Each structure stands twice: as C-alpha cells, then as structure tokens.
C-alpha cells in the first residue's frame, strides 16, 4: 500500500502516472483541505475534488481542476447576484459542492462525505481529506488577512503578502489518515506547493511523527528554478523559506529518505535524485511514476 500526500495541481499529474502502473485499490491519497471554503452556500474542496475527478476519469486536464466539458450557466447567472461568486464553478462541479455541503450540514464528517462521493463516482483509490476539522490558509496583506482562494483567484496572486497563516494554528489529522500512514508500506510527498498544499498536511498533529517511521520519497515542485504552477515562490518567500528545491527539501528533511528534483534545476540539493519531473502528458507522468516506484523498491 502506498500513501501519497497531495495538493490539487502538481501531485495529480504524478497520480495520473501511478494510476497507469499501480492498482487504484493500493493507493491512498491524503489531500490538503486548507483551501476549502463555503461559497454561494456550498462547500468547495478543490484539491479533494481534483483527485476524485482524476480517478473517476472526469478531470479537465487542460486546467487540472473541474470536470471536463462542464458548463457554467449557474455561475454566469450568479455573478451579477452574488459578490461572493469569485470562482468560476462548473455546473456539474457545483452539484458535487451542493451534495457535500448538505452532507456536512446534516452531520457527516468531511471524510464520510468524501467516501460517499468516491463511491458515487466509482473511485477505487482511497481519497482522504487530511482533517475533519475546518482549516484555512490565510495570507497577510496590507489590508488584513484574506483566504488563499481570494488571494489566488480573485486577486490573481498579485497582492503583496507578508506572511502565510493557518487558522486554527493546531488541528488534528483524521483517524482515517493516521491509520493510512500507520498501515502503508511507503509514502510519496507529491510535487505540490510545499506551503499551501503539503504544509497543512504536515502540520496535522501526529503526521510528522508517523512519516519518520516510514520510507518517504518527496518530489520537488520546482522545474528549473521555478515552480511549474501556482504561487509557490511568493508564498515560500512570505513564509521565510527559500523558494527553491533546496528550500522545499529543508521543509521535508526531518522525515524524507529520497528527495527527487528536476534534471533542469540549477539549485543542487545534496544527495537528491535527478529525474525529468515536467509531466506535460500521460507518458511523462507514467515515466516519473515508474522512477519513483523504482526508488521506493530501493528503500524496502
């Protein structure tokens, strides 16, 4: 059994490769939920949904979010009616948010709601939100704290930020996540944003302790000297971390056994394994996944 720590953009590309090589039933994906929020009355869990849609064969892999071929009629109708509708949510995607919101309002945990959605979509991989507690990533601007989604989507990451804040400061991993980490044979830390995607998972109580007991392979999100997607560099700077593979390794060094960085990366991480981590298509995703699995066998 393999457990993968994932955000919503970089790591799903690696999951695409693992999907081609490993039976879905042997994969557990622990997913960041610190970017979740309620919007237009419904519960958005973007990283969880990306992983569900990937394994369901529905993901829009042009954008790496949402459902392929979705329409946006409800969003277009809501925009003039709601100041809060700042994210373009597809109609089928919104149906998932509505269903999840209803389950949460009726007393289900996020883990239970996610399990129900996976069953509904026929997903065989085990997809686990990192925590059942509400967690939010906020960024500090000159006008105060704003949610990460507002910073990245509404303001396109163009607002100067001074720090990254998690609310609340302490939160627990779900029992299902703790069990998955205890029972798995190895852990892959995917190439997602180390501050806003992987960071919240690592901040869950007990998670770092469990990782130290397992073989762990981490893949840097940096291609060359820049992250392939998202605002990782700006967020790492605001967190006081060097925006590079070396800075990423520094966040993981306490538990990682093998660190993988891109062949084009000019910043050398001592002891790192060099691979082509630019997963621009299925073939590239599968090739990197095969490399990671081979490295995993070397740790057995």
Swiss-Prot record:
Its EC number is 2.7.8.28. Its cofactor is Mg(2+). Catalyzes the transfer of the 2-phospholactate moiety from (2S)-lactyl-2-diphospho-5'-guanosine to 7,8-didemethyl-8-hydroxy-5-deazariboflavin (FO) with the formation of oxidized coenzyme F420-0 and GMP. InterPro entries: CofD, CofD-like_dom_sf, FbiA/CofD. It is an enzyme of class 2 (transferase). The lineage of its organism: Archaea, Methanobacteriati, Methanobacteriota, Stenosarchaea group, Methanomicrobia. This is 2-phospho-L-lactate transferase. It catalyses: (2S)-lactyl-2-diphospho-5'-guanosine + 7,8-didemethyl-8-hydroxy-5-deazariboflavin = oxidized coenzyme F420-0 + GMP + H(+). Belongs to the CofD family. Pathway: Cofactor biosynthesis; coenzyme F420 biosynthesis. Gene3D superfamilies: CofD-like domain, CofD-like domains. One of its GO terms (molecular function) is LPPG:FO 2-phospho-L-lactate transferase activity. Keywords: Magnesium, Transferase. One of its GO terms (biological process) is F420-0 metabolic process. 7,8-didemethyl-8-hydroxy-5-deazariboflavin binds at residue 49. Homodimer. Pfam families: CofD.
């Amino acid at each position: 059994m393999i457990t993968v720590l994932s955000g919503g953009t970089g790591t799903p590309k690696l999951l695409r490769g693992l999907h081609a090589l490993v039976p879905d039933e042997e994969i557990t994906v622990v997913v960041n939920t610190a970017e979740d929020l309620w919007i237009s009355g419904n519960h958005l869990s973007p990283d969880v949904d990306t992983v569900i849609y990937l394994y369901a064969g529905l993901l829009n892999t042009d954008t790496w979010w949402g459902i392929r071929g979705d329409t946006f009629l409800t969003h277009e109708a809501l925009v003039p009616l709601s100041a809060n509708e700042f994210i373009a949510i597809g109609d089928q995607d919104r149906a998932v948010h509505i269903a999840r919101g209803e389950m949460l309002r009726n007393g289900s945990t996020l883990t239970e709601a996610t399990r129900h959605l996976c069953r509904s979509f026929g997903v065989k991989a085990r997809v686990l939100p990192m925590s059942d507690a509400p967690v939010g990533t906020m960024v500090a601007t000159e006008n105060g704290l704003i949610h990460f989604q507002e910073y990245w989507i509404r303001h396109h990451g163009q607002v100067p930020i001074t720090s990254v804040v998690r609310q609340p400061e302490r939160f627990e991993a779900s029992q299902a996540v703790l069990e998955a980490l205890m029972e798995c044979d190895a852990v892959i830390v995917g190439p997602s944003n180390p501050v806003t995607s992987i960071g919240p998972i690592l901040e869950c109580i007990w998670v770092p302790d469990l990782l130290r007991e397992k073989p762990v392979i981490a893949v840097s999100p940096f291609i060359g000297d820049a992250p392939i997607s998202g605002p990782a560099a700006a967020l790492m700077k605001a967190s006081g971390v060097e925006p590079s593979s070396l800075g990423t390794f520094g966040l993981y060094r306490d538990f990682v056994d093998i660190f993988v960085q891109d062949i084009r990366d000019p910043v050398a991480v001592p002891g790192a394994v060099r691979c082509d981590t630019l997963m621009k298509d299925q073939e590239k995703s599968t090739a990197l996944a095969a490399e990671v699995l081979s490295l995993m066998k070397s740790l057995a």
